[in-house]
């Protein structure tokens, strides 16, 4: 039996709170069960040097975990003087996923910086971050349109993400830490609101998985993401 008596296809309770902070153009507290991530989207004029004169905008992301977001305290990466490989991998994933949802030409020569800070971690922090950041991004883009900084809406579609995996021989959706840490397979899936795949990250950490198991996990992800996007839409409305 899964924690909380969840079925294999069931996500944790998901909550999205908009306008969580006062200063960012878009800010969201996203909660996947006990995983809580603060996501902000900041609109800034100008683009990186490689895009100057192109008429195209840019979106980039940063990710971090508070020292006591985990069971035992960890040092801040700033105190260590460098980011871990895991942090760099996750923030690149968040940036790639969100860029897929935006028409950068419609953004003009402006940049959106997304910051995802994990307040409390219980598995699935990167998928929660992508999900919350998408809503913060929508609010930042609406702010920019309201200010006349962009004309047409650069957002192409909503995106969301969820973890899936195989635990005790069974494919399950939205793994919390006790499941994730013991899973034979761990996978993260990012999809659009129409069910198209943006990214799949999957690793057999214990036993290799079959083609059939892969399809089962993707189907679980599609079902879970559909529900998560419904939650995004409800928050935005």
From Swiss-Prot:
GO biological process assignments: rRNA catabolic process; rRNA processing; tRNA processing
Q: Name one GO molecular function term.
A: tRNA nucleotidyltransferase activity
Disulfide cross-links: none
On the tree of life, the source organism's domain of life is Bacteria
Note the coiled coil stretches, chain numbering. Answer: none
What reaction gets catalysed by this protein?
tRNA(n+1) + phosphate = tRNA(n) + a ribonucleoside 5'-diphosphate
Q: What Gene3D superfamilies does UniProt report for this protein, alphabetically? A: GHMP Kinase, N-terminal domain (3.30.230.70)
Q: What class of enzyme is it?
A: transferase
> Sorted alphabetically, which keywords does the UniProt record give?
Nucleotidyltransferase, RNA-binding, rRNA processing, Transferase, tRNA processing, tRNA-binding
Which amino acids does the record list as binding phosphate?
86, 124-126
E.C. numbers: 2.7.7.56
Q: Which residues form the signal peptide?
A: none
| Family note | Belongs to the RNase PH family.
So what does this one do? Phosphorolytic 3'-5' exoribonuclease that plays an important role in tRNA 3'-end maturation. Removes nucleotide residues following the 3'-CCA terminus of tRNAs; can also add nucleotides to the ends of RNA molecules by using nucleoside diphosphates as substrates, but this may not be physiologically important. Probably plays a role in initiation of 16S rRNA degradation (leading to ribosome degradation) during starvation.
Question: What interactions and quaternary structure are annotated?
Answer: Homohexameric ring arranged as a trimer of dimers.
What protein name does the entry list?
Ribonuclease PH
Q: Which gene encodes it?
A: rph
